[in-house]
Amino acid sequence: MPSYVIHLSCAKRALEMLPEMNAQEQNAFFLGNMIADMCRDKHYTHFWNNVTYDKLVRRPDLDWFLQKYGDALQEPYVRGYYAHLLLDYNFLDLYWDRHFRFYNAQKQPEVLYDAVTFVEVLELQQMYDRQEFFSKKWYYGDYDRMNAYFANRYNVMFPNLEFNAKEWERIRRITEIDWDYAPEAMERTKAQLSQSVAIAEPGIIPQLQIFVLPELEQLVEVTAKKVAEI
C-alpha cells in the first residue's frame, strides 16, 4: 500500500480541488485520510473482505465501506477515510498490476498471501525473494527515500486530535478504529516524518530502487480528482 505520506499528499491535492474547508474541517479530512493505517490490525480498518484477505493483493472493499458510511460521505472525516481506501485500491490496480508479478516457491504465478515466495519487477526484469523485496533495502526503503520529497512537494498537513465533543461524535462513527492505540501510533509517525523532512535536501529527487516516481505522482493526481468528484 502507499506510504502515509503519499496518502497525505493525495489528500492535500484533493483538498485543493474541493470546495473550501475551514481549518477544523481540513484537520478532520486529513485525520480520516491516515487513521486507517494507525492500527495494529488493518483487516477491518481497510475493509478487506473474506475474498481478498487470504491474498497478497488485498483490495479494500469500497462497496462495503459505502454501505456502512456512504450516508456520511460528505463529512470531511468520512470523505478523507474513503480517499485512503480509494488510493489503496488504485495503487494495487493501477501500479502493482502494471509493475509486479508474484510467484510461489516453484516460480509459478501465485496470489495467496502465505504462498507468494518471489516478486518480479517487470521493467527491471528482476526476480526478488519476497522477504528481501518487502524490506528497507528495496520496497519499504523506497518509501523512506521519498517520504520527505512528497511531504515537501505537496506541503502535507499532519492532523491533530483537537476536536470538540460534537466533532468526536462524527469521528467515532467509523467504529473500526482502535482509539486506545491510534494516538500513540500517530505521534510516532509524526516524529518519523519530522525527522525525514529535517535531514532531506529540498528539491532533491529521490533515487528509487523499485518505484517509478512520476507514476506515483500521476496516481496521486488521478485519485485526488476522483475524491473531489464524489
Feature-to-residue mapping (PLM):
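N-terminal leader/auxiliary helical segments
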Residues: 1-230
